[in-house]
Regions:
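Conserved, structured C-terminal
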Residues: 1-257
Length: 257
């Protein structure tokens, strides 16, 4: 195994360009190349990987991504060629996308991020995030088996997706509390962004009793900046009011390719 990000890899060095979305195959195949290489890309199954030359670029291409898109690629190219490849893909129709946009897609897809829905201040494991089926307890060499089972026997919460009911409200941040209709804290926001319709959409770690779809909760957005108790504030002072949220299905309906 080699670290292809390390300069010691020399000509084999690689950096990653993510090309995601319904038009990504069409854009990728606009690059000049042999029919065999294009066929390898066009026939790539999910999580498949191939090594081809397209547009004169030596590429390792995987059918992967972290945006929830069914059509998605990651292009591993030498760092000296990355900028040229990026600009050529844009000229062929790709739209540049920053990390915030990518994160909004991740959250909408219900995918966990290390430090938010995995590990982080709440010490969450794969099952907390809804990915417990990836933990292979049948493997005899899994040294964390006992600890995982013990944790699962005690776990009372799980990650959910939620959406604020109104637009134009203060965005929740990691660590903001979720409360039930009686004002009891039942969860903690782990991630939040804005969806394609202008609503704040996020993920939170909540008590299992409140994880059911369409459950109504409220979030104290910006709780770290909350003002004093309203009974202790003078006229004209402001304090944070909770915004109502709706719990969504753990993952969105799977889109066809």
């Amino acid at each position: 195994m080699r670290d292809l990000r390390d300069p010691s890899a020399q000509d084999d060095m690689r950096v990653d360009i993510a090309l995601q979305g319904p038009a990504s195959t069409e854009i990728l195949l606009k690059l000049a190349g042999l029919d065999a290489d294009k066929a390898a890309v066009a026939g790539l199954p999910w999580a498949g990987i191939t090594h081809v030359t397209l547009g004169g670029y030596d590429l390792i291409i995987s059918r992967t991504g972290y945006t929830g898109e069914r059509v998605a690629y990651e292009l591993f190219v030498h760092p000296d060629k990355a900028a040229a490849l990026f600009h050529e893909l844009v000229e062929l129709g790709a739209t540049p996308c920053g990390l915030a946009a990518r994160d909004s897609l991740r959250i909408e897809a219900g995918l966990p991020l290390y430090g938010h829905e995995l590990a982080g201040p709440l010490g969450m494991g794969p099952a907390d995030a809804g990915f417990g089926n990836y933990v292979k307890l049948w493997k005899p060499f899994f040294v964390g088996k006992k600890a995982h089972i013990q944790r699962e026997m005690q776990r009372e919460s799980i990650v959910v997706r939620f959406r604020l009911n109104n637009r134009g409200v203060r965005p929740p941040h990691q660590g903001d509390p979720l409360v039930d209709t009686k004002g009891r804290t039942v969860g903690i926001v782990t991630s939040c962004s804005i969806d394609s319709e202008g609503y704040q959409l996020g993920q939170a770690y909540v008590k299992a009793d409140y994880a059911k779809r369409d459950t109504q909760l409220a979030v104290f957005s910006g709780s770290a900046r909350m003002k004093a108790n309203p009974n202790e504030t003078a006229f004209g002072k402001k304090y944070t009011l909770p915004d109502v949220v709706t719990v969504l299905s753990r993952f969105p309906a799977r889109r066809k390719k």
